[in-house]
Regions:
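Electrostatic cytochrome c docking/interface patches
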Residues: 15-31, 46-50, 65, 112
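Non-transmembrane alpha-helical segments in soluble domains
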Residues: 27, 67, 71, 121-128
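Flexible coil segments in periplasmic/lumen-exposed cytochrome c-class electron-transfer proteins
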Residues: 19-22, 32-33, 41, 77-155
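Short microdomains enriched in Cys/His and/or Lys/Arg
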Residues: 57-71
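Bacterial N-terminal signal peptides
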Residues: 2, 6-14
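Conserved beta-strand positions that form and line the central face of beta-propeller blades
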Residues: 54-56, 78
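Short, cysteine/histidine-rich loop/knuckle motifs that typically chelate Zn2+
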Residues: 37
């Protein structure tokens, strides 16, 4: 039984460590895109630059919907698009930039830093696997900041 228990612990540890690079790359893409500028480090959103951002922890959007939102943003809101090819053809909601001529209020906003396909998938996987439906934890806080900080106190 001791051997089986040790094997179980080893397999579980390996599985947890295998997810660490995915978490790190997804978090890196989240930071590169400056998602925390609106959605905050914790992913709960709230007031920020340009208004209140959606809580990524409480969103009901599925993976494909999240990919579309990250790639294309949300016209008429402060959610920018992160795919540098967005709105150059009709891949985003069947619309092109020309559809917004004379309508600057609803024109999609460019991200300050574009993400490539791999980064977009990584940030969406990070949202789905590490934020969506989960509470903010001290462990997550320490992973986000790379060390314990005052933000982690009280979690």
């Amino acid at each position: 039984i001791k051997i089986l228990l040790n094997m179980f612990v080893y397999i579980l540890s390996y599985a947890l460590l295998a997810d660490a690079p995915k978490f790190d790359y997804g978090l890196s893409a989240y930071k590169k895109g400056n998602c925390m500028g609106c959605h905050k480090w914790h992913g709960d959103g709230g007031p920020g630059y340009g208004g209140a951002a959606l809580s990524l922890r409480e969103t009901g959007l599925d993976r494909e919907q999240l990919i579309t939102i990250v790639e294309c943003g949300r016209p008429g809101t402060n959610m920018p698009f992160f795919d540098k090819k967005a709105y150059k053809d009709d891949r985003c909601f069947g619309m092109k930039f020309s559809d917004f001529e004379g309508d600057d209020k609803n024109r999609p906003l460019n991200a300050k830093s574009y993400l490539n396909k791999r980064q977009i998938n990584a940030v969406v996987d990070f949202i789905v696997n590490d934020l969506q439906g989960k509470k903010v934890s001290k462990e997550y806080c320490i992973k986000f900041f790379g060390k314990p900080t005052r933000s982690c106190d009280g979690l």
